[in-house]
């Protein structure tokens, strides 16, 4: 076994400390692989991956010594820099009661069914028990009736969704290639560099109001690990295929509204709306609408990738957290002018089937989201890090939970990954065991015959909101059978 001198303690970045203690999980579904070769291929691939990225064998632990004298709650990754043997970071199981075909084609599940899938397939619980080791990453390969499910749980202290996607890219290459390329980015140097990017920008006004300690709450009998199970009876999980062509139509319509109305929030104008702005605005509109005006607590949380918002841009292949939740006000009623323009646009284009009032509400929510995202600039990010640096206690810090949350994995190229002969390409990608109200835009599937791939949305919704959501004309207009 390696000696003590090879033990490493890598301090997490300030942005890492702004995320809660969760273990999200990617579930990659493969139909009918060569089951006898899967175990050997994955084990050999992990051995190569560990040699390239030894920190993935580690645990997240509190820092000690001189570092802790400067601030409380500082965390680091403890691992062996040069392991002599691969650690058991993958386990193999069988469950012939499950089917890739059934799970991947299911359009809706109860919360209990979804949590059961997470408990069966995930190597780590979503909400870890503080008394147990907090692992950087763990894998589980489960053989089911018609294929294999490869699940990767990762600590949100160490990876954001984009970073975990890049790790999976490296893993696929290690499984496929006899001699994979080394990681061309020094992850530890970048992680430490984030402590020093604030420069002279100072602290963003009101930033402490956006980031605060988690409130105390009553834990269920099973502790933190049982939180998803406690929430499960009160929720529904929906999976929708959303027509890319119709999202494009609504995006163009909303941008026509924008050009006619010149949406402003304070002193700042919104110049354009993206397809993702429109889709998240639409799902927010479908979720809850109060004809009397803004719903109390109706803010919209959107996860924003910060890598390309710094100047110069942060390396795309960075594993660590470079994301932040943008909190946008939502669900305000459209103005009379907005309704009038929406009525005109709907009347002029027979392809627009939703009601003009729904289009106007969608437009307002999309503009609110775009305006909020556009405020996350280079100066804002550096100021955010400056504020984190000023905190004497970093544990735990997190953003408050808005009325509805969205995160997008559409940019992840997980469907393009080739795991080689034993597994091949991924047939389906999901996640399980999350909590409402959350919309996840899943990775973009391969396009068929040159057409734009449909949007793939996983939606965690409370049971009380589910009937109203399913009745919404906007949603019926967009979904693909």
Curated annotation (Swiss-Prot):
Protein name: O-acetyltransferase andG
Keyword Lyase: no
Any GO BP: terpenoid biosynthetic process
Organism: Emericella variicolor (Aspergillus stellatus)
Complex and partners: Monomer.
Phylogenetic lineage: Eukaryota, Fungi, Dikarya, Ascomycota, Pezizomycotina
Keywords carried by this UniProt record: Acyltransferase, Transferase
The keyword Iron appears for this protein: no
Coiled coil location: none
EC number(s) stated in the UniProt entry for this protein: 2.3.1.-
Top EC class, one word: transferase
Pathway participation: Secondary metabolite biosynthesis; terpenoid biosynthesis
Family matches, as Pfam families: Transferase
């Amino acid at each position: 076994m390696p000696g003590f001198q090879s033990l490493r303690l890598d301090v997490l970045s300030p942005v890492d400390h702004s995320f809660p203690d969760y273990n999200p999980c990617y579930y990659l579904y493969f139909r009918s692989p060569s089951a006898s070769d899967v175990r050997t291929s994955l084990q050999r691939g992990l051995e190569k991956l560990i040699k390239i990225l030894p920190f993935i064998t580690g645990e997240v632990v509190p820092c000690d010594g001189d570092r802790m004298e400067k601030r409380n709650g500082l965390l680091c990754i403890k691992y062996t820099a040069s392991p002599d043997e691969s650690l058991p970071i993958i386990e193999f199981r069988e469950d012939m009661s499950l089917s890739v075909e059934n799970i991947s084609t299911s359009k809706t599940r109860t919360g209990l069914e979804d949590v059961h899938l997470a408990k069966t397939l995930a190597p780590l619980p979503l909400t870890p028990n503080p008394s147990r080791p907090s692992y950087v990453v763990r894998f589980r390969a489960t053989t089911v009736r018609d294929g294999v499910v490869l699940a990767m749980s990762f600590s949100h202290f160490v990876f954001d969704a984009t970073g975990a996607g890049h790790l999976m890219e490296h893993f696929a290459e290690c499984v496929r290639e006899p001699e994979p390329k080394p990681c061309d980015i020094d992850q530890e140097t970048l992680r430490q560099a984030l402590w020093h990017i604030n420069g002279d920008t100072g602290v963003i006004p009101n930033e402490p109001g956006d980031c605060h300690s988690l409130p105390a709450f009553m834990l269920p009998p099973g502790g933190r690990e049982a939180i998803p199970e406690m929430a499960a009876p009160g929720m529904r999980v929906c999976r929708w295929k959303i027509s890319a062509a119709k999202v494009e139509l609504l995006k163009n319509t909303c941008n026509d509204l924008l050009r006619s109305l010149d949406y402003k929030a304070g002193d700042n104008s919104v110049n354009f709306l993206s397809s993702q702005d429109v889709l998240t605005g639409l799902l927010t509109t479908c979720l809850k609408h109060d004809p009397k005006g803004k719903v109390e607590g109706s803010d919209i949380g959107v996860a924003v990738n910060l890598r390309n918002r710094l100047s110069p841009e942060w390396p795309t292949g960075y594993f660590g957290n470079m994301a932040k939740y943008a909190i946008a006000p939502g669900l305000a009623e459209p103005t009379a002018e907005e309704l009038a323009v929406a009525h005109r646009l709907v009347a002029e284009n027979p392809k627009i089937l939703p009601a003009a009032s729904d289009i106007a509400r969608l437009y307002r929510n999309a503009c609110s989201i775009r305006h909020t995202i556009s405020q996350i600039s280079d100066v804002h990010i550096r100021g955010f890090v400056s504020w984190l640096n000023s905190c004497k206690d970093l544990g735990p810090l997190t953003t408050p939970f808005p009325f509805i949350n969205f995160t997008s994995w559409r940019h992840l190229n997980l469907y393009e990954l080739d795991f080689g002969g034993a597994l091949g390409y991924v047939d389906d990608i999901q996640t399980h065991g999350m909590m409402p109200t959350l919309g996840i835009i899943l990775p973009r599937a391969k396009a068929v015959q040159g057409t734009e791939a449909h949007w793939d949305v996983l939606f965690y919704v409370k049971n009380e909101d589910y009937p109203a959501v399913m009745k919404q004309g906007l949603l019926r207009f967009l979904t693909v059978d």
